[in-house]
UniProtKB/Swiss-Prot annotation:
Assembly with partners or alone: Part of the 50S ribosomal subunit.
Gene symbol of the encoding locus: rpmD
CDD domains registered for this protein in UniProt: Ribosomal_L30
Organism: Neisseria meningitidis serogroup B (strain ATCC BAA-335 / MC58)
UniProt KW keywords: Ribonucleoprotein, Ribosomal protein
One Pfam family it belongs to: Ribosomal_L30
GO BP, one annotated term: translation
PANTHER family associated with the record: LARGE RIBOSOMAL SUBUNIT PROTEIN UL30M, MITOCHONDRIAL RIBOSOMAL PROTEIN L30
Protein name: Large ribosomal subunit protein uL30
Length: 61
């Protein structure tokens, strides 16, 4: 089976002052603090979370 694509996501803005659902999306992606980078699988669920908090993130494929 082919390896799934991954997306590299970096939190570039702080979560302070954001609404709770946006903080939950960041936690769901595995982001803990500013400048923290994680690799997540390219799934519709992860894409939805990335789109919701795109103003806080830098995304590389």
């Amino acid at each position: 089976m082919a390896e799934q694509k991954k997306i590299r996501v970096t939190l570039v803005k702080s979560l302070i002052g954001t609404i709770e659902s946006h903080r939950a999306c960041a936690r769901g992606l595995g982001l803990r603090r500013r400048e923290h980078t994680v690799e997540v699988l390219d799934t519709p669920e992860n894409r939805g979370m990335i789109n919701k908090i795109s103003y806080l993130l830098k995304v590389e494929s």
